[in-house]
Amino acid sequence: MKTSFLLLGLTLVLSSLNAQSAKEEVDFMQSVFGMGKKALVAEFVKPGAAQKDAFWQLYDEYEMARKELGKKRIELLLKYEENFDNLSNELAAVLLKEIQALTMKNDKLVASYVKKVSKATDPVVAMQFHQIEMYLLSEIRISIASSLPYPEIKQ
C-alpha cells in the first residue's frame, strides 16, 4: 500500500517535470521513495541479529547504485516525452536500445547484490531480498509503462 502511494506520487511528479527542475525533483522523490522503500523492505527481509548490520550495509550500497540507474531511466523518460510528437524511427531505435541496456543493468545489479547478500547473510535472506526487490521493480515498471503514451507509426 505504501509503495502504491509512493509510485502514484512519483508518477504525478514525473508527469509535471520540466527540464530545469527535473534533477531536484528526481532527487527529492528518490529520497522520499527510498525512506519508504527501506521501511517496506524491513517488513519483508528478516536477517538474524548477527546478520543485520551486514545486510543493511549491502542494502544501502545497492540503493545508491539503483538510484543512479533510476536517474538515467527518468532522463530517458523525459527524452521520450519531449520528443513524443516528433518521434522518428531513428530516435525510437536509440531510446529502445538505451532502455533495454538500462533494464539489463538493473537486473544485473539485483543479481549481483543477491549473491552478496547470500554470502554475507544466508540464502533465505537473499531470497527475501530478491523477492521484494523483484516485486517493487515490477510494480514500478508496470506503473511507468501504463502511464506512457503509446507510440504510433507516423505516415
Where are these regions (language model features)?
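Amphipathic, charged alpha-helical segments and their helix-to-coil junctions
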Residues: 25-28, 32-35, 39, 44, ...
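Bacterial Sec-dependent N-terminal signal peptides
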Residues: 1-24
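Amphipathic alpha-helical segments
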Residues: 26, 40-120
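Intrinsically disordered, low-complexity segments enriched in polar/charged small residues
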Residues: 7, 17-19, 42, 71, ...
